[in-house]
Amino acid sequence: MSTPVARSATRWLACLAWLLAAVLLAGCGVNRPLARQAAARVALERPQQLDCTRSDHCAIASAYAELARRARSDSRAEAPVHYADALEQGNEALLLRVHLIRAARHSIDVQTCIWAEDDAGWLVLDELIQAARRGVKVRILADQLFALDDVDWLARIARAHANLEFRLYNPTFDEAVTQPVEFAASLLCCFSRFNQRMHNKLFLVDGEIGIAGGRNYENRYFDWDQQFDYRDRELLVIGPHAGAQMQASFERFWAHPRAVPLTRLNDVNARIMREPLAAQDLAMPAGVDAARIEALRRRALDATALAALARRMLRIGVVD
């Protein structure tokens, strides 16, 4: 049985917690003057020139792109054609992502919950930036609570290229990085909204080559963690009907009011205004295994090996 002293202490702690939440709430909200200044600096510093002037934006040849062309050609409204393959191996799933990024001609849309600042996370981000520079429209949507807690990275991504857009879903207190005190306050004041996280994972190239399943962007999802790796499964689907469905799903999330551009986040904007951009490249994090990243990049250009993987694709009909 609790004593009067214990009950009184509990009430005081509860009052202090609510007071803390109220103080944090009073200070939340987008700093609009700062946002305008940061947006202006981003517009000024973000490059628009392209590394490629070809109409295909220097996309590499790909057996998967050929399957997409074949599915598009053979499909009819009443009888769509698709190709599908289950991706069981994490390393293979990462290899295909890098290959498909380099094979993209027009657009890449990526949606995820977790994005870590490790080997896999840096590699995919760097490849997406390179795709944007050659003319591909790149959009990334990640959950704020579990993606990229390095404000330096985010400030640099915001200015990487005019073809690259990055949004965070449901940011806490209009910031990219949630501090422990803010996390606790969110649980107290607004748990219902705070708990609405985005767990969807989608990787879509040119609106017709899509990967959906359980993998986020972190070493342990791609068999690259030396201590512990997840066993996940994804489905690679190629074709117009499924591609349109995946595109529509992404667009709904992208247009949602809780999908917030980086220049609407106070901590990112403060970093943008404090540190003029010296270079557009993301620095490789300390401890990253550069050798295995380079090895995977070479494999992503191996047309013979990738064609062998593409031969596993099964021709199917409707995908729902």
Outline where the language-model segments fall:
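Bacterial N-terminal signal peptides
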Residues: 14-26
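Charged, low-complexity intrinsically disordered terminal segments
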Residues: 28-201, 205-320
